[in-house]
Design a protein with these regions (language model features):
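Extracytoplasmic/periplasmic sensory segments of membrane signal-transduction proteins
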Residues: 62, 68-216, 266-270
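Extracellular structured ligand-interaction cores
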Residues: 76, 178-180, 187, 220, ...
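Short, acidic, Ser/Thr-enriched surface-loop or helix-capping motifs
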Residues: 185, 244-245, 282
Length: 291
C-alpha cells in the first residue's frame, strides 16, 4: 500500500513537471514579448513626442518671427514720422520756449517733474556701476558735446521741442518696444526723449558708429547690437538721415530698441518648462549670400 502511494506521488510530480514546464516557458516568452513591445511603443512614443515638440518649437519661432517683423515695421513707421516732423521743425522759426540741457536733469530741476523707473531707465557711472536715472516724459533733454556752444545750438533745440508731443504719444502706445527716440544734428546738438541726465562728459553722438556709418541715402539703417554709452544696456538702433531742403545732410533721427525688453516680450510656452530661454541671433554671414 505504502509503495503504491509513493508511486502515485512520483507519477503526479512527473505529470506536474510535464504540465507546468511548458506553462513557465510560455509565460517567460510572453513576458519577453510584452517587454519588447513596450520598448518599441516607448521608442515610438518618444519619437512622436520629439517630433511634436519640434513642430511646436517651429510654430513658436515662426510666430515670434512674425511678431518681431511687425515690431520692425512699427518702429520704421514711427521713425519716418519722427524724421518728417524733425525736418519740418528745423525749417520753422525758433519758438520762444524753455530748453532744458542735460545739466538741468542732473540737478533735478523741479520744473522737469522727474520720475524714476528703476527697472527700465538706468545710467552707467564712471566706475562702471549702473543706477536708476530719473527721466521726464514731458520733456526732451538737449546735450551739447565738448567744443560746441549752447548759444549757437539753442535755436535748433527750441525748434525740436515741437516733437515732444509726438514722442509722448508714441511712448504711451509702444513703450514696451521703443526705449528712446533722438535727433543728432551735424552741429553736435543731441535731442533725446524721454529727457534724462547722466551723459558721459566726452559723449558726442557724431562719434558713435550708428552716426558715422550711416549711408545718408535716406533709407532706414539698422545698427548691429551694441552697448549704449549712457544706460549701459544692449540696444539695436533704427536710424535715418535728415536732409535740408537742398538735400544736404544735417543729421540723423533714431530710435533705440532695448534687446532686454524685446526678449522679455517673447514668452516661451509653459509646456517647455522653466528652463527654456528665448534668444535672438545676429546673422553676420550666410553660405548662400551670393546665390
Amino acid at each position: 500500500m505504502r509503495a503504491s502511494l509513493q508511486i502515485r506521488w512520483k507519477i503526479l510530480i512527473v505529470l506536474l513537471a510535464i504540465g507546468i514546464g511548458p506553462l513557465l516557458i510560455s509565460a517567460w516568452l510572453d513576458t519577453r514579448s510584452v517587454s519588447a513591445l513596450g520598448a518599441r511603443l516607448a521608442e515610438q512614443s518618444g519619437q512622436a513626442l520629439n517630433e511634436q515638440t519640434r513642430r511646436n518649437l517651429e510654430l513658436v519661432a515662426e510666430n515670434y518671427a512674425r511678431r518681431v517683423e511687425r515690431e520692425r515695421q512699427l518702429i520704421e513707421l514711427a521713425l519716418r514720422l519722427q524724421a518728417r516732423e524733425a525736418g519740418t521743425a528745423l525749417r520753422a522759426p525758433a519758438p520762444a520756449t524753455d530748453v532744458f540741457w542735460a545739466d538741468a536733469f542732473d540737478a533735478a530741476v523741479p520744473a522737469l517733474a522727474l520720475v524714476t523707473e528703476p527697472d527700465k531707465y538706468r545710467a552707467r557711472a564712471n566706475d562702471g556701476s549702473v543706477a536708476p536715472v530719473p527721466v521726464a516724459f514731458d520733456r526732451q533733454v538737449f546735450f551739447n558735446p565738448q567744443g560746441t556752444e549752447r548759444l549757437q545750438l539753442r535755436d535748433d533745440a527750441a525748434r525740436l521741442t515741437a516733437l515732444t508731443s509726438l514722442y509722448r504719444e508714441i511712448h504711451t502706445d509702444h513703450q514696451n518696444v521703443i526705449y528712446r527716440q533722438f535727433i543728432a544734428l551735424a552741429s553736435g546738438l543731441l535731442a533725446s526723449y524721454p529727457g534724462h541726465g547722466a551723459f558721459p562728459p566726452d559723449y558726442d553722438a557724431r562719434k558713435r558708429a550708428w552716426y558715422r556709418e550711416h549711408d545718408r541715402s535716406g533709407d532706414i539703417r539698422w545698427a548691429p547690437p551694441h552697448i549704449d554709452a549712457v544706460s549701459g544696456r544692449a540696444f539695436i538702433n533704427a536710424t535715418i538721415a535728415l536732409h535740408d531742403p537742398d538735400g544736404q545732410f544735417v543729421g540723423v533721427a533714431g530710435i533705440n530698441v532695448s534687446l532686454v525688453d524685446l526678449l522679455q516680450s517673447l514668452t516661451l510656452p509653459a509646456a517647455l518648462g522653466s528652463d527654456g530661454e528665448a534668444l535672438l541671433t545676429y546673422l553676420i554671414e550666410h553660405a548662400d549670400a551670393d546665390a
